[in-house]
Swiss-Prot record:
GO molecular function: carbohydrate binding
Glycosylation sites: 55, 150
Keyword Glycoprotein part of the UniProt annotation: yes
GO biological process, one term: response to symbiotic fungus
Species the sequence originates in: Medicago truncatula (Barrel medic)
Record-given protein name: Lectin 8
Induction remark: Accumulates in roots during colonization by arbuscular mycorrhizal (AM) fungi (e.g. Glomus intraradices).
Keyword terms: Glycoprotein, Lectin, Signal
Main function: May be involved in arbuscular mycorrhizal (AM) symbiosis with AM fungi.
Gene that produces this protein: LEC8
One Pfam family in the UniProt entry: Lectin_legB
Length: 275
């Protein structure tokens, strides 16, 4: 079992690709079995990079900006990821890691019936170029208008928690929020309804995301406890990680608001992989 222990690294400007790649390579996860667990986030949290509007406050990782009253700010985007290059696959042996990640989160519209835009859990190449601007709104902090649909340019897989339907999103049920699996583009390959509007405002959601290399199945399960009722949804998609992503990757979160806003708070996060 391996782990990495640099201090929390906070930036005000997007990373240089060369600097980021260097930092990640010197903190490579060498072990075939790897895990980390963050029961909360604060300034003493190790091995986490935050960038853009992301911040840590009172043990919570806030992906997008809030005002002094805790209300969400429009046109905000931020990201956070683990400072360590995760060994996802081995070309020589042909092996691909299985992994499981779990996190608890709150997306709160603060009284607004219409809200947006959402957040993602992502797995990306070490040299993935996160946009320096124009990645708010429906681009969810991962893409801009130039990269959002250019599948040959990107090397990223994401599970999106999308609370506002844009023109590229599927019409599952009107403008209902949805979760989706994105492969190198903001246009989801598979989607399912996200029951955020059916639970009380401020409810804690729990996400369980896993990958099975034998079946090449990526699965995301989201659960809310709504009194005696369990609100649950799941989405899965077959994807060959070895064909989409390099041997070493980074894992993390992004979030964004547009004209409409909501909070995007990660309360806890764990990750386990076995190659």
């Amino acid at each position: 079992m391996a782990n990495s222990n640099p201090k929390l690294l906070v930036t005000q400007n997007p990373f240089s690709v060369f600097l980021l790649t260097f930092l990640l390579l010197i903190t490579n996860v060498k072990s075939d079995s790897f895990s980390f667990n963050f029961p909360k986030f604060d300034t003493d949290t190790k091995s986490i990079i935050i960038d853009g509007d992301a911040n840590t406050t009172n043990g919570v990782l806030q992906l997008t900006k809030k005002d002094q009253l805790g209300n969400p700010s429009p046109h905000s985007f931020g990201l956070s990821f683990f400072l360590g290059a995760i060994h996802l696959s081995d070309k020589q042996s042909g092996k691909v890691a299985d992994f499981t990640t779990e996190f608890s989160f709150v997306v709160n519209p603060k009284g607004s019936q219409l809200h947006g835009d959402g957040f993602t859990f992502f797995i990306a190449s070490l040299d993935y170029e996160f946009p320096e601007k124009s990645s708010d709104g429906g681009f969810l902090g991962l893409f801009d208008k130039e990269s959002a649909f250019n599948t040959s340019q990107n090397s990223i897989v994401a599970v999106e928690f999308d609370s506002f339907r844009n023109e590229w999103d599927p019409q599952i049920a009107g403008n209902s929020p949805h979760i989706g699996i994105d492969i190198n583009t903001i246009r989801s390959s598979a989607t399912a309804l996200w029951p955020i509007d059916r639970v009380p405002e401020g409810s804690i959601g729990k996400a369980h995301i896993s990958y099975n290399p034998a079946s090449k199945k990526l699965t995301a399960l989201v659960t809310y406890l709504n009194g005696p009722v369990i609100e649950e949804t799941a989405v899965s998609y077959t994807v060959d990680f070895a064909a989409i992503l390099p041997e070493y990757v980074l894992v993390g979160f992004s979030g964004a608001t547009g004209e409409l806003a909501e909070t995007h708070d990660i309360l806890s996060w764990s990750f386990t992989s076995n190659l």
